[in-house]
Amino acid sequence: MKNTIAVLAVSSLLAFSACKKTENTAVADKTEASQPEKFTVDSVKVSDSSKIADSLTVSFTSKLLVFPALKDRKLLDSIYFQNKGIKDFSKNGLQAYLESDKNKYFKSVKNDSKDWISGSYAQDWYTNSHMNLVSNENDYMHISYLWSSYEGGAHDNYGFSERVFDLKKNKKLELKDITSMPKAKLESILMKNINTIHSGTSDNGGDVKNSDMLLVEVIPATDNFYFDQKNLYFHYSPYEITAFAAGDIVIPVSWEELKGTLNTEFKERMKIK
């Protein structure tokens, strides 16, 4: 009888331990599942060239960032706004997209440049595009997009796009999310600050002011902006507001100049006094 009681006691203890272990495992699994995926950044790149004819060689280079932790489709579509038709945002999916994009580019140049190919002198054409993560602070992620190309003519062309994404709200940040300042007043500040950051352009007489190369009477307050702890910056590509010789132009607007118009949530997240 005593042996029977002992066996039952041991069996009960083992059953209790197994049950407890199962509960602990379930709690651990639940805790692990509730942890958000760590924010990481990777990249994919394709660089290749093709000899279209004896007179023409074309090169293709493109780099895309990869964000494994980002799952929101609308946010991802906005991040890859220059790359239409992406269905798979994984590293393998983006690599495959770039390979397809490269092949389409080579094919289009071959089909669209038959008249030029018959020319008598050789040239090298190219197209480049790059995504670069500039910063990710206070859940505001700033990505800079650069493209450049040459397909005949006097010189190559290039341009920039700046985009800031609110990772808390899964959306691209708009100017209205930062300031309520009327557009006309903001544009007057841009005109006033046009020479704050020198473009580096010079001629025989020395440095040339940005304002001396303006092609517009009003500098538009566009969505091509980014910011840091001191300023809001507007970035303009060649020909957008100035002559090509001026290059790209960056115009800062200080938080002090925007005082009284800053969005409360933005101001708190950026810790602007």
PLM regions with names:
Residues 15-18:
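C-terminal motif of bacterial Sec signal peptides marking the signal peptidase cleavage site
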Residues 20-273:
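Compositionally biased intrinsically disordered regions enriched in Thr/Gly
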Residues 2-9:
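Sec-dependent signal peptide recognition
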